[in-house]
From Swiss-Prot:
Family, as annotated: Belongs to the phosphoglycerate kinase family.
EC number(s) given by UniProt: 2.7.2.3
Pfam families: PGK (PF00162)
Lineage of source species: Bacteria, Bacillati, Cyanobacteriota, Cyanophyceae, Synechococcales
Protein name as it appears in the record: Phosphoglycerate kinase
Compartments reported by the entry: Cytoplasm
Length: 412
């Protein structure tokens, strides 16, 4: 299901000069209490697409969401929109600094105010529309709202991978009115790595899956068992697998309704000849707290009133040994409670191992979410082959799901 991309459009000689191009970006950035952007990674990620369009002489109209401004009253169904703290105005300022050119900010995303800003654009200039989620119709994928948004432009570029798993007006709905609808450079790169790594990898292929709950990773584990040579599990989910084998887990997090599932996943790994590795030792704590008492124990010796919060040093060694020689490694989810420094050692060790593998020529893909934060925390983000910008979108793509924002694009 190959899709048209901005790269293929430009290389085919398509003339973008003077064309109004609606670009759906993901500018859902964190802001502090004063409205300052605390992390501009997502803005920087959109730069290659924006710069390619300005250089081609297009009139660039950027759109995005920020936060969750729409609040629905459960009792009455009444809708309130919280504009305070959710405006994209700070993004326009930062984008202008990064691009080295003015970015016109429209105080609305549809209607006369948006039209006035777009109409003033010259070739190679950039405008940013206000938060599309100020309209509840955005998340409802309302056709009339999508039509109004689309009426501002001549063609559509989706570069918001982080929102590609949502069928919203600005990610999917506008494609009914704007053709061609193509993938931007960021989306193209995400698809290339996250789909390519699973469908056509250099082998051996290993996946490392962490995180606190099996329930959130069922789909991805099931699919990976059909594709990988090795599967390494860490994070809070491991205790459900231990209890499924009759191992006592103390007060560790266990999803008792997923014990049968854990057994069936272990069985499936065996049937498929996948090497499934679980930690052999864990760092346990007497309570869930950064200052808790901690000790490292074998998985067969977890004290009754203690809880596991990280993988232990022997597990790190076993994981490092299993990863040696792997040509492709996909990682999603931390090995422990990495927000607490003393329970972050397992996650940090795996991050360093992947950085070394990258240096040795392996393809390493950090599949979104908390594992990205963990890699950034140890300053190794630039040492990986690819860091995904998606959370839920990365996970759904790894699960093999069709993402609505991608499905809606023009076929190649």
């Amino acid at each position: 299901m190959a899709k048209q991309t901005l790269g293929s459009l430009l290389s085919s000689g398509f003339d973008l000069a003077g064309k109004r191009v609606l670009v759906r970006a993901d500018f859902n950035v964190p802001l502090d209490a004063q409205g300052n952007i605390t992390d501009d990674t997502r803005i920087r990620a959109a730069l290659p697409t924006v710069q390619a369009l300005t250089q081609a002489g297009a009139k660039v109209i950027l759109t995005s969401h920020l936060g969750r401004p729409v609040k629905k009253d459960k009792e009455t169904g009444a809708v309130k929109v919280a504009r305070e703290g959710n405006s994209l105005a700070p993004v326009a300022t930062r984008l202008s600094q990064l691009l080295g050119q003015p970015v016109a900010f429209a105080p609305d995303c549809i209607g006369p105010e948006a039209e006035a800003v777009v109409n003033r654009l010259e070739n190679g200039q950039v405008a940013l529309l206000e938060n599309v989620r100020f309209y509840p119709e955005e998340e409802d994928n309302d056709p009339e709202f999508a039509r109004k948004l689309a009426s501002l432009a001549d063609l559509f570029v989706n570069d918001a991978f982080g929102s590609a798993h949502r069928a919203h007006a600005s990610t999917a709905g506008v494609t009914a009115y704007l053709q061609p609808a193509v993938a931007g450079y960021l989306v193209e790169r995400e698809l290339q790595f996250l789909s390519g790594a699973i469908e056509d990898p250099r082998r051996p292929l290993a996946a490392i899956i962490g995180g606190s709950k099996v329930s959130t990773k069922i789909g991805v584990i099931e699919r990976l068992l059909e594709k990988v040579d090795k599967l390494l599990l860490g994070g809070g989910m491991i205790f459900t697998f231990y209890q499924a084998q009759g191992i006592q887990t103390g007060k560790s997090l266990v999803e008792t309704d997923k014990l049968d599932l854990a057994r069936s996943l272990m069985e499936k790994a065996k049937e498929r000849g996948v090497e499934l590795l679980l930690p052999v030792d864990v760092v346990v704590a007497d309570r869930f707290d950064k200052d808790a008492q901690a000790q490292t124990v074998s998985i067969h010796a977890i004290p009754e009133d203690w809880m596991g919060l990280d993988i232990g040093p022997e597990s790190v060694k076993a994981f490092q040994s299993a990863l040696q020689g792997c040509q492709t490694v996909v990682w999603n989810g931390p090995m422990g409670v990495f927000e607490f420094d003393r329970f972050a050692l397992g996650t940090e060790a795996i991050a360093r191992t992947l950085a070394d593998l990258t240096q040795a020529g392996a393809t390493t893909i950090i599949g979104g979410g908390d594992s990205v934060a963990a890699v950034e925390k140890v300053g190794l983000a630039d040492k990986m082959t690819h860091i995904s910008t998606g959370g839920g979108a990365s996970l759904e793509l790894l699960e093999g799901k069709v993402l609505p924002g991608i499905a809606a694009l023009t076929e190649a």
